[in-house]
Amino acid sequence: MAASSSSGRRRYDVFPSFSGVDVRKTFLSHLIEALDGKSINTFIDHGIERSRTIAPELISAIREARISIVIFSKNYASSTWCLNELVEIHKCFNDLGQMVIPVFYDVDPSEVRKQTGEFGKVFEKTCEVSKDKQPGDQKQRWVQALTDIANIAGEDLLNGPNEAHMVEKISNDVSNKLITRSKCFDDFVGIEAHIEAIKSVLCLESKEARMVGIWGQSGIGKSTIGRALFSQLSIQFPLRAFLTYKSTSGSDVSGMKLSWEKELLSEILGQKDIKIEHFGVVEQRLKHKKVLILLDDVDNLEFLKTLVGKAEWFGSGSRIIVITQDRQFLKAHDIDLVYEVKLPSQGLALTMLCRSAFGKDSPPDDFKELAFEVAKLAGHLPLGLNVLGSSLRRRGKKEWMEMMPRLRNGLNGDIMKTLRVSYDRLHQKDQDMFLCIACLFNGFEVSYVKDLLEDNVGLTMLSEKSLIRITPDGHIEMHNLLEKLGREIDRAKSKGNPGKRQFLTNFEDIHEVVTEKTGTETLLGIRLPFEEYFSTRPLLIDKESFKGMRNLQYLKIGDWSDGGQPQSLVYLPLKLRLLDWDDCPLKSLPSTFKAEYLVNLIMKYSKLEKLWEGTLPLGSLKKMNLLCSKNLKEIPDLSNARNLEELDLEGCESLVTLPSSIQNAIKLRKLHCSGVILIDLKSLEGMCNLEYLSVDCSRVEGTQGIVYFPSKLRLLLWNNCPLKRLHSNFKVEYLVKLRMENSDLEKLWDGTQPLGRLKQMFLRGSKYLKEIPDLSLAINLEEVDICKCESLVTFPSSMQNAIKLIYLDISDCKKLESFPTDLNLESLEYLNLTGCPNLRNFPAIKMGCSDVDFPEGRNEIVVEDCFWNKNLPAGLDYLDCLMRCMPCEFRPEYLVFLNVRCYKHEKLWEGIQSLGSLEEMDLSESENLTEIPDLSKATNLKHLYLNNCKSLVTLPSTIGNLQKLVRLEMKECTGLEVLPTDVNLSSLETLDLSGCSSLRTFPLISKSIKWLYLENTAIEEILDLSKATKLESLILNNCKSLVTLPSTIGNLQNLRRLYMKRCTGLEVLPTDVNLSSLGILDLSGCSSLRTFPLISTNIVWLYLENTAIGEVPCCIEDFTRLRVLLMYCCQRLKNISPNIFRLRSLMFADFTDCRGVIKALSDATVVATMEDSVSCVPLSENIEYTCERFWGELYGDGDWDLGTEYFSFRNCFKLDRDARELILRSCFKPVALPGGEIPKYFTYRAYGDSLTVTLPRSSLSQSFLRFKACLVVDPLSEGKGFYRYLEVNFGFNGKQYQKSFLEDEELEFCKTDHLFFCSFKFESEMTFNDVEFKFCCSNRIKECGVRLMYVSQETEYNQQTTRSKKRMRMTSGTSEEYINLAGDQIVADTGLAALNMELSLGEGEASSSTSLEGEALSVDYMITKEQDEDIPFLDPVSDGTWRSFYSAE
């Protein structure tokens, strides 16, 4: 078959090329009729006059057809018209990918292909006659077309049954080739995978009539998949119908069935007036017809029986597809071929959501987390994804965030409407079970829920209707949207009164009902999810909280309080089946509680001293869990607990005995008594069904006389067992796991025991154990741990039968001398022999071991030759293997991973080894190794580690054969002097030569390298790296001999990180390059570097600490992506361009201890248009401290959480006045600089760390209040407490807010008093009120001040005009200007001159409280909207948190 046709509009489905004399009235007419019957549009020539050249309309028809059918017949080659058509078809086949079907009608395909025989004679005659009338090369084009088209697989009448059969086959083939997916389904993500899977079940090539079911939960997309499938298959089935079942009511069953049959036949036969008067017409009319029937949303078995009773009702090749949510309908109708529609994967679900919400396959970067959460809230259900996505379409991020609480807590109405249909179809009892699972038991074990609900049928019904799923490990899984549906249905019944619901699952509702005692008889279950156990609010339960809940059956809560809970209850509902109360404060259950219906009693970590008095009717009780109830002194009488299956008393420290009545619990299977100091275990002698016993205590008394253990024990856990040996009557036939660690056992038992089920044996730390029992019958043993069995001398040879052994730990068996030989442990994955100093032979074992730890403290290990055979496993790790040399018979041809770290010899082996399987080799720490082995045949090696091989001088040239090598590490190879030249390791991405202190030159050994580490080497210059165009990271730290970088570094346009820390010889960097991808540049400690680096304007993180740079130049404004600039301890730095304040992205700038800084070149334009984005973070003088703090991983991308922003000029004592003023006016984020006096324009000031301000009315008309604060901090004195950050606490209208700014520990690096500035805002409540400020840090705050700020609504031009018209008196150099202060006018900040503004109000004295009366006192300065966006909000704090602290002073 030819390649598929190119996309685009086509006028015709089929173009036929034929000889009219041979086939027009016979074969062709039949074929056109068959194609027309399948609605296939075929070109018909309608008597176009034929000549030697084909007509233009024919050329157009050929090109606009999707398929050409070429009918080769006896006289086809007699027509130049036909041959020229064929040339055009051949061209479309090659150029347009048109599909071509050749048909050989009474001719031999080989004669056509080779132009021989009768066909060849006709062709040659045509060529001879027309040679003068056709172009010279026309014959060659005819020959090529005949040869190529005849070579395509087609239909041959001579080899077929008959002409009719061939017509049908060709028409079907054409139909299949024309099938394309309907564009209506293009937006349904993943639908093609479903369709292909269903097609494989349908087996369309089969002639039998077949019924197939499509099954899945509501909203999963079954109907959509069905419609898409129907659309694709329709062209193959002229007789077809798609019917959706509609529920009907009424008693006329016969009429309903006749109506169904009429609808089906009308759809299939296309007749609207069909009359049906009796049943069975469907079978009669369609018995011999090939049909496609799809029945959707089937919820009635009679519907199926009436329309598609049996597959035999329909003709050969028919396909019946039934879509339903109920698996039982399919079973009842004997439909065994079922396709289950499952939830899409996380990736597909996200794509579905994004198609609906964003119209594309992935979310915008800033919507990723929200999109993931919405997809999760939809439970990956296609219906939910589509509905939620549509509801969020074309909404901004803020709107998404505002809608999230509603999506988390509720259920969309459209989703609920669709899912509710499934619930409404359930019988009442099944509806009750659905609600019970949705509200209480989603995610629980099936057996657990069956016991509580006493229903084995209901769960099966819900599962068959796709309302729940039973997981492979036996848990109930209900989709989260169905769970929300159930809870919404229950909530709706109560009409707003939680006490009248059936189930309570929300803390607030439970709190209300329990605290206010509003529970009613309707309430069946209370369950608080575990995540709400730790609510900050206590659940106040008193003695009568449960008194109104007469019918409560399920109670699962926890204790959240810090005290005040009752130690006793008056009443517990008598119908309780589940009592699950962790940390219960009760000392005992109420005496009125009878426990008659109780199935599960779970009271872990309780304060119980006893459960109840006397004997209660416990016939329903199956599980009792009192884990870690440390005050429990006795277990109640269990005489009536004949159905008890599990009893957990682990950690009940006060319990001393088990009641003799426990022997009546004949169904007890699990008993946990670890940590219980029992007097004796004789009461266990009647426990014939006990399978799980956990004792785990060394102080069990009366154990020496034990003569009986339950015979069906599967798991015995008895750590610290005081017995010397188990009794001879101990039965191990059913034993699966034996754990007796740190026991006093000397031996387990005598003789051979039937250990066929035993899988685990843990005897670790049994220091008296002298021998391991016979394990010859332990053929399923998988794990053995006898670590620290110090008395063990030999290991049993019977271990050889443990062919499934995976884990064997014999470490620290100090007396172990020998190990059995000839063990066949092919499954072994872990073997530990460390700490066995007397072991004189290594086990000669065949094994598939992936991890071997060898004995320590020996100079030589004798290894049997058979160990080193071709079965040597991949991943073998010879860690700390102190061999002198590898065994002479070592054959590593199957070795995948070779780790021989700390190898002691000078070479690994002699000659060339076959290493074709080797992928990783580690010879690190082999200090004596002078050469690595010949690796010329290790062509699959990907990772080679030679770290700390100090004697290694060079690498062999054969390393050039390692074309798959991805990573080469040679760190601290101090003897390495040269690398081989003229090699190109084409796959090498990481090369680490750091610490190779003798390496002076670096030849480029790979053009594919991405990470290159050359730090701490003796390299003097970097050679041409222009060919390393993939390089992303270049690390040259501590290359002290390096003076510069080559200009060819400009070719490295993928370089993202360049680290040159402490390259003390580096003087200059190239200036004529721009590394477009460079994000991190670290030149810290380059003490000879005098000029600001200009090798990239895209730098994000720039480290220039301890350099000799003298100026931050004006071109800093071009660094538009810069976020971090560290220049502390730059003693030669004198000038900083004010253009640094233009960088909106800059978040950190630190000039601490730049004591030579004199000024920041003032520029009135810069000040007037300032867009505050400049901030900094404080750092210490210690460079290493900075590295640790900012880098996380040494060479990461630097994408850190920058947290607090900060602009630091600490200890910059030479800053002139203009520079200080410019810095202060430019920042509304934290700033630090030397100083001991708050600027006078801070209108509210006070001594100490707090002040109270009465706000002017004009400020309360703002939506938000904005403040700038200033503190004077004495770094040499201690404050009133320890704080990690400098904190602002703010009280307003009875509420408290808080914000943390710079890290407090940075203050210790200040040498004198410093000023700290910060800005913040919060939402105004439009109420005139006092506000309180309190500032906290670990050092003494001498003085504090605040001022109000306002956001201007004017343009920059209007602001400047307004400024020029205002009149005020201002001191600025020698000029004076006057401004009137009246009414609500606000003085705009006009740059540097405004800093010296003298308010006519006077300065006054600072005090602990400031109240400035009068509207004129609202004078302050304007900020732009852009500046306001950078000001952080204060965070609200919980009631009392700050107030209590504030009052404590």
Swiss-Prot record:
A GO BP entry is: signal transduction
- Looking at the keywords, is Transferase present? no
Q: Which domain of life is it from?
A: Eukaryota
Q: Which PROSITE patterns match?
A: TIR
Start and end residues of the LRR repeats are: 549-573, 574-595, 597-618, 619-642, 644-665, 687-710, 712-732, 733-755, 756-779, 802-825, 826-849, 915-939, 941-962, 963-985, 986-1011, 1028-1052, 1053-1077, 1096-1119, 1120-1143
Please list the GO terms describing molecular function. ADP binding; ATP binding; NAD+ nucleosidase activity, cyclic ADP-ribose generating; nucleotide binding
Which reaction(s) does its UniProt entry say it catalyses? Answer: NAD(+) + H2O = ADP-D-ribose + nicotinamide + H(+)
Q: Which residues form the TIR domain?
A: 10-178
Q: What is its EC number?
A: 3.2.2.6
> Quaternary form?
Interacts with RSH1.
Q: What function is annotated for this protein?
A: TIR-NB-LRR receptor-like protein that confers resistance to the pathogen Hyaloperonospora arabidopsis isolate Noco2 (downy mildew disease). Confers resistance to H.arabidopsis isolates Emoy2, Emwa1 and Noco2.
> Which protein, by its recorded name, is this?
Disease resistance protein RPP5
| Annotated source species | Arabidopsis thaliana
